[in-house]
Every structure is written in structure tokens, then in C-alpha cells.
Amino acid sequence: MMRLIIAAAGFALLTAAAHQDVALKALMPKGMVIGVAINQRQFEGADVAAVDMITTQFNQISPENVLKFQPTQPAADRYAFDAADRYVQFGLDHHMQVVGHNLVWHSQTGAWVFQGADGKPADRDTLLARMRDHIRTVVGRYKGKIHGWDVVNEAIDEDGSLRKSPWQVGIGDDYVAKAFEFAHEADLDAELYYNDFNLEKPAKRAGVIKLVQDLQARKLRIDGIGNQAHWRLDTPPIDDIDKALVELHATGLKVMFTELDINLLPNTPRGADPSVANPYANGLPDEVQQQLARRYADVFRVFLKHRDAVTRVTFWGLSDADSWLNRGRMNYPLLWDRERRPKPAFDAVVEALRNAR
């Protein structure tokens, strides 16, 4: 029996090693990069194992938080670039495509940005000046180093209208256009993107398409649309993902899946029964592991079917342990488990990529 246990353990180690010898980036079609959002411990090198995985598996990185408005400009008269500098340098040192996320968003932006000197809401001219200063300072600092920027994030509401964010209220509907204008002025060579979620929903997708067409009509640079791709096992249906991709690409822009993960937990109210809210606290059942693998295989087949349109796929986190979707529960949305071992979902993605070659 002991020999069987030792043999099984040895087989498991060999299998894991074989998996880790497979690099996703080596299997991607020409013109399509594969990336991951990384956190500060990772790009600063404190998590050595993570650094090895990131640089082995991926050829693109996005920052979880360090390039957002609040971390880079915590006060009107103060910028803070230490962490952002290290993130960018990590990508350059490892010859990876570096993406900047994000410049203008209604969240993670200091309240001071939207306040006037009298404590009332800032007027249009004040807000435009602050936006221009921020974008020119941040984008200008990394000119020639950051490949592309999520210029505006989540500006469209679920009904397809422009979200009534502090930016929209203070500046007007043209705040998005102004952000793209300022970003291009700061780095003429950087790619510029619009990024949002739920683009499989027709009304929201129509609003995004209308927005980017307005930017195009103004002759402003916009290179791509980022579909965040925070999905679930059964939703959105694969046909809806396919249809959304086709319609977004019909704008003439690149399509990118920028924050990919697959949420396995139910939406439950605060205080819900733990057995309902956190059903996989003791591990993920094999049946659900296989469902996750099939889901990842299906979505990657769509990406590969439209390889003429899709230029990037980025996972939002390296492993289940790193995912923002845990939130005090046990979620399993990515390709590697909490011990950073490849899951059946990893094998499914590898197979889909190999079959498409």
C-alpha cells in the first residue's frame, strides 16, 4: 500500500511538472497575447513562485490597482509613483506587453477631484483641468513604456445610457472624448482602449458601440474595446459571447478580453446561510471542476474562432488564491488552484489552443 501511495504521489508531481512545462503564451495564435493582472507582492518580487509562473505562462500584464487615479494622485498637489514604477519596470525587465489600467473611472478616485474650492461640486473647467493634468502626468511618465491604456472604464450604464458619474455630471457627455484626447496628446504612440463589463447584454453593448462611434466621428484615437469578461458557469450563453464579439469588432476596433474569470459562487444577500453563500468551503467537487473546464474550453474556442478580431486575453488574477472574487468566501474562478497547481480548466485551455494551431 505504501508503495502505491508513493507511486501515486510521484505521478502527481510528474503530472504537475508536465503541466507547468506547458506555456500558454507559446500556444497563442500570432497577434494574440495572453496576460494576467498582477498585484504588488508579485511585481515587487516578494512572491517568487508567482513571478516564475507569470513570466513563464504570460506575455502581457495588467495592474490590479497601482495605476488607478487614487493610488497615483492621492491629493491635488501630490503624485505617488513608486509602486507604479515597479510594476512598469517588472514588465519591461521581462519583455512583456505592459497595459495601464485605468485613467478615468467613477471609482477609486479621490473625493477631492470632484470638489470645488468652496466645497461645492467642481465646475466643468476645474474638472477638465484636473483630468488633463492627471492624464498628461501619468501617461507622460510612462511614454514609450506602456503599450496601451484603459483610458475610460465603465462609463455606460446597463440600459446603454451614459452613466451619471461625477465625471459626467461635472463635465458633460463629452468627458469621455476629452479623456481620449488628453491621453493621445500625452503619448502619440500608445494604444487607447475603452473598457467595460456585461457587453453581452444588447442594450449595454449598443451604448458602448454608440460611444466608440462618437469617438471615431470626432477623429479621436481609439484602438480597442475591452470586454472585462467577468462571467459565470452558465451565463452569459456562449452564443451571446460570440455575437457580442462580432458586433464589437464591426466597429473596426480590436476586441480584448481584459479581466477574465468565471465566478462559481451564487449571488447571496449579506448574512445568508453559509452553506448557500459559500458552498465550496471545503473544496471544489470534481463535477464542478469539469464544468469549469468545459466553460473555459468553450470561451477559448470563441476567442480562437475570431482570432482576426481578438488581440488579447487577460486573466484577472494568477490563481484562485489571488482572485478578487473570494471576498471572504472560497471561489475557484481561475486556471490554477490555491496551491497554484494547474486545474482541469488549465488543461482544457491548453487543448483548445493546441487544436486551433
Give residue spans per PLM region.
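Substrate-binding cleft and catalytic face of glycoside hydrolase catalytic domains
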Residues: 21-24, 56, 60-74, 83-200, ...
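Substrate-binding cleft/loops of secretory-pathway carbohydrate-active enzymes
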Residues: 198-221, 321-325
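Hydrophobic faces of well-ordered beta-strands that scaffold small-molecule active sites
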Residues: 34-38, 59-63, 98-102, 147, ...
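Boundary/entry segment of secreted carbohydrate-active catalytic domains
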Residues: 19-60, 64
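Bacterial Sec-dependent signal peptides at the C-terminal "C-region" and cleavage site
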Residues: 9-22
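Short, acidic/polar
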Residues: 41-55, 129-138, 204-215, 296-302
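Acidic-and-aromatic substrate-binding clefts and catalytic sites of carbohydrate-active enzymes
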Residues: 37-48, 69-82, 156-161, 199-207, ...
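Aromatic-rich peripheral "rim/lid" segments of glycoside hydrolase catalytic domains that contact
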Residues: 24-26, 111, 120, 137, ...
